[in-house]
Every structure is written in C-alpha cells, then in structure tokens.
C-alpha cells in the first residue's frame, strides 16, 4: 500500500510538472509565435530600414529578418525561389523584372522612396570639384580608381554610369573603375582609403563618417532614383502585407527622411 501511494504521488507530480510546463506556451501572444517577415532589401536601405523594422517590432511584437544586397542579386534569388515575403528594390527595373515573371502580388506594389547619387572622397581628402558637363574627374583620381557598384546590373552603378555619360566624362574614367558587388561595398572602398573617390547614394555617404560628399550629380543626368516595394507572390505570411504597408505610414516615413531619403507620395 505504501509503495502504491508513493507511485500515485510520483504520477501526480509528473502531471503537475507537465501542466506547469504548458502554461507559458498558453500565455504566449499569437504575434510572438508567428513567423518573421522575410525581407529582401537593397543594400543602401540598411540603416533606415533597420530602424523602421525595430520600430514595427516594438509596436506589434512581430519580427522581421532582413537580407541586404544589390537589387540585382536579390531579384535573381527571388527568381530562383529563395524564401522571402517582401522585396524592396533600389530601382524600377529589377522590380519590373520580378513582376514580369509574376513573382509579386501586383496590388501590393508601391513606389516608396527617392534618393540622389553623389561623388564622395575620404573625410580628410582635399578633393574639390563642381559637377558639371566636362568636369575634371580623371585628374582628381590621380593614380587611383573610382569606386562604383557594378555598372551593368546594380542600380547605383547604372545611375552613376548614366550620369558620367550625360556629363561627357565617362570615356575619361571608364578604365579606372573599381566595381563592387553593391553600393555599400563601393562606399567601403572609399571609407577604407582603397579608392580616392566613389559614386554612391547620398544616404550612404551620410551613414559613413569616414567619407565626405564632394559633389551631387544633377538629377537630370540619370534616370529618376525610385525604391519600389512589393509583397512576393509566394508569400503566405499574413504579416507581410502589414509590414509593407507600415513602410508608408507617418510613423515610418520620418525614419527614412532622417537618413536622407525622399518620401514619394
């Protein structure tokens, strides 16, 4: 009888422990148990988008996981069925690329932000110039190279090349280009002193204290810089549309403006 009582006591204790272990799960909010929103975003968005995502998580209790890279690389990954919920490109071309392949939800697409491209140098550089037709870019480089994102596929590189062609100076520097995989990598070349000059977004320059802006390229020298956003067609995450919509709210837009982006209405 004594042993039976002990066995019953042990069994009851086990049931109670199991029940206690289940209580925290029952009390976890549904938002905390939902899957993170997987975001593919242009590298130039990192500082601002990190702030916006943190704000959204604080307000909703929901999480994001953001992969930053060149828009071209991200679009190709999306085409290859990489798991993602939201895509933010640094130009219209790569958003069009995935849209033409029916990889986004068309009704979710919106133009979010604008930007400028600038010529940057190291913070202690004495380089100075006025960006105008025929300006002396080659002499400013000396024996160094001009850092740019890939000029054939990455938006910042394409914008930069278009501007240099429009200003009539591309032919003088085309053999002095140091191409990087994305605009932040190009910025890093200048920031580290590995290239005397670079062409990056104005927002990138503002994010790095080791560079300074030498000049701003006139907007009429290159296609308009537009950052579109869309939810991917393959996304089954119910929070994806909510996050994409949050990017255009009065709470989020000032965080983009703080980093130097232009808000598109």
Regions found by a protein language model. Give the residues of each.
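Twin-arginine (Tat) signal peptide motif
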Residues: 1-23
